[in-house]
Design a protein with these regions (language model features):
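ATP-lid-like helix-loop hinge signature
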Residues: 40-76
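GHKL-type ATPase core
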Residues: 73-74, 99-235, 332-340, 350, ...
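Bergerat-fold GHKL ATPase/HATPase_c domain
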Residues: 1-53, 87-94, 224-225, 229-235
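Conserved tyrosine-mediated DNA breakage-rejoining catalytic core shared by Y-recombinases
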Residues: 313-346
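A short glycine-centered beta->alpha linker in the GHKL/HATPase_c
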Residues: 83-85
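Charged regulatory segments coupled to nucleotide-binding catalytic modules in large multidomain enzymes
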Residues: 151-155, 178-200, 209-251, 362, ...
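Acidic ATP/Mg2+-coordinating residue in the GHKL
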Residues: 79
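Helix-hairpin-helix
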Residues: 252-272, 277, 312, 362-381
Length: 612
């Protein structure tokens, strides 16, 4: 490495500006489609989180209709959601990796990239600002016109104004280079499939040609809202544990004028100048009602034996629990002073927990989902840690040992599925019935399962015959209610479908068969940031196979009954053709004039195909 070589740091927005292919903005065709996706998904997520039946309107207009593609378009998306607080609008749309979707709960978005990347792409291809209109109360609307400072990863507000409106919601409009002649079919498919998997939403799309595509809601009930949960022990790594440990440490509060005012207020001292002993008596009486920072200050006072005035002239340098020493800097004497701490003191435990953090069992019970005291004790024995081992005293090697044990301990309960919001069998069935109008339709929702500590649920539906126009198996893939239209060849769902021996289920040739697959999870294992295909994790693949097996058996039963019905109809047609001739021949042969009553044999009740 050359000594003259220079080093620089770039911002997240600069990185994705240079590598925008990673987020799905590789060319005008893909970029227009990806921008549509990101804005619609943001609107649907916002409505879902607040329990609002979504009404989303999108329009794409060419800036110069006569110009050939690729050319500039204006993409606008408007919703009836809760809007975004005015103070958050610039950062939400002008900062890469800023958002509200980083918690452990199900949402369409997960990287904090999409909408901002669309804005960044629009800016670098047209140099035109973004226009955002947001109202949270349905009375006042904030309108921003802004750009993104790519090098600093910060918004640049060009204009901000407010006006009165009649309803809440969010509207976003950007200008970007796109190729609708190539992307149009994908965009229309995306809107169509989004309506299929979101039957409780109304979605309207006005395309550049003036055509309108409108899909109204078919159900008025929404899936239950997902909740944010604590992580599962099987889904963590050393870095996650390290960050958790930082959260368990409580900083020694600075004893400045503001802290002394806080202490006086909580102790009810007002401006009284009490002696050290009187202050400590008050502390004992009010201990349970004090906040942790105030408790820590009072614990320090107990060992330093100072009043407020003297305490404000010191800075704590070190709390050495192992040697039971408290060291502070005395500004009045300009020297460092150490005092002994009595381990039997009432206040010693307060400082010990501040410095050393929680015990292992307390840490497990408070920081992870579905881990109670009994399970925590079992784990401590399994991992060969003492239950009272303080987390803050662990070495790096012990942290690695703890992480490995958490991932391999089998007695933890399965992940909590309350963070998931599957669509539900009934809404999925109604959505498929509206779009496909099949002869046979079956849906299934599997129970919650998990991969690497992240819960997931598989929903799947099969439709056959009727008005299904496709010949051959057509698969619609969804993840957290996002249609996946690209890169299907490397997706786990296609792998499962292609590995199925359909002849076992009486499906042959190129059948009019549709499969709808929906994976919902707090962490979809996408292969790329573009969110187009799902990795073949063994646990997910297994659940997909079981769901498909269940539905395939029902389809096989339907096909058997249909085959029997068709065979009966063929027999009836055959009898209708030959029995009259046989009756006539037998009558002549017997020398009779009247033919036997054979019509009853071929005019029985019609056979009705049974629908499942």
């Amino acid at each position: 490495m050359s000594s003259e070589e220079s080093f620089t740091q770039i911002s997240p927005s600069e990185f994705f500006y240079r590598n925008r292919d990673l987020a799905g903005f590789s060319n005008p065709t893909r970029s227009l489609y990806t921008a549509v996706r990101e804005f619609i998904e943001n609107s649907l997520d916002a409505c879902d989180q607040k329990g609002i039946l979504p009404d989303v309107h999108m329009s794409i207009k060419a800036v110069d209709a006569e110009k050939p593609d690729p050319k500039q378009y204006i993409l606008s998306v408007r919703d009836n959601g809760p809007g975004i607080e005015s103070s958050h609008v610039p950062l939400a749309f002008g900062t890469v990796l800023y958002g509200s979707k980083f918690g452990l709960k199900q949402a369409r978005g997960m990287f904090g990239l999409g909408a901002t990347m669309a804005i960044l792409y629009g800016q670098i291809t047209t140099n035109k600002p973004l226009i955002v209109k947001s109202s949270t109360d349905g009375k006042i609307q904030d309108e921003y016109e802004m750009l993104l400072d790519i090098q600093k990863n910060k918004p640049v507000i060009l204009k901000h104004e407010t006006k009165e409106v009649a309803k809440a919601g969010l509207s976003v409009s950007i200008r970007l280079e796109g190729d609708y002649s190539k992307a149009g079919s994908k965009i229309r498919d995306y809107v169509y499939q989004t309506s299929l998997i979101t039957p409780y939403a109304t979605i309207t799309f006005d395309d550049p040609k003036g055509d309108r595509y409108r899909y109204t809601k078919v159900v008025r009930t929404m899936p239950p809202s997902p909740t944010i949960i604590r992580p599962h022990p099987h889904g963590i790594d050393v870095e996650t544990i390290r960050r958790m440990l930082l959260d368990t440490h409580y900083q020694i509060p600075a004893v400045d004028d503001n802290m002394i005012l806080k202490v006086r207020k909580e102790l009810g001292l007002a401006n009284k100048n009490l002696s050290y002993s009187e202050i400590m008596d008050k502390t004992q009486k009010k201990w349970k009602a004090l906040t942790r920072p105030v408790r820590t200050v009072m614990a320090l006072m107990s060992f330093l034996k100072m009043d407020f005035e003297k305490l404000s002239k010191t800075t704590i340098e070190e709390i050495d629990i192992g040697n039971k020493k408290l060291t502070y800097w005395d500004f009045g004497e300009s020297q460092s002073v150490s005092v002994d701490m009595d381990p039997e003191s009432f206040y010693y435990k307060q400082l010990a927990s501040t410095v050393q953090g929680e015990t292992l069992t307390s840490f497990l019970s408070k920081r992870f989902q579905r881990v109670g005291p009994t399970t925590a004790l079992k784990f401590a024995e399994f991992a060969k840690f003492k239950p009272e081992h303080r987390i803050g005293t662990m070495t790096n090697q012990e942290l690695v040992k703890l992480t490995d044990a958490l991932q391999s301990f089998d007695d933890f309960m399965a992940p909590d599925p309350s963070c998931l919001a599957p669509l539900g069998e009934s809404p999925l069935e109604k959505g498929m019935q509206r779009f496909f109008e099949p002869d046979f339709l079956a849906v299934v929702q599997r129970g919650a399962s998990a991969y690497s500590g992240f819960p997931f649920i598989i929903e799947m539906g099969i439709a056959y015959g009727g008005k299904i126009a496709s010949r051959g198996i057509k698969v619609y893939r969804f993840a957290n209610r996002i249609p996946l239209l690209y890169d299907e060849g490397s997706d786990v769902v296609l792998k499962v479908v292609n590995d199925t021996d359909w002849s076992r289920y009486k499906v042959k040739g190129e059948p009019p068969l549709v499969i709808v697959s929906h994976i919902c999870s707090t962490r979809i294992p996408y292969k790329t940031v573009g969110k187009e295909n799902v990795a073949d994790r063994p646990e997910i693949e297994r659940e997909l196979k079981l769901a498909l097996l269940s539905l395939s058996r029902k389809l096989s039963s339907f096909m058997s009954k249909r085959g029997q019905a068709e065979a009966a109809i063929k027999r009836k047609n055959l009898y209708s053709k030959y029995i009259p001739l046989i009756a006539q021949f037998c009558t002549e042969l017997a020398g009779k004039k009247k033919e036997p009553n054979y019509k009853k044999m071929i005019t029985e009740e019609p056979i009705v195909e049974e629908k499942t």
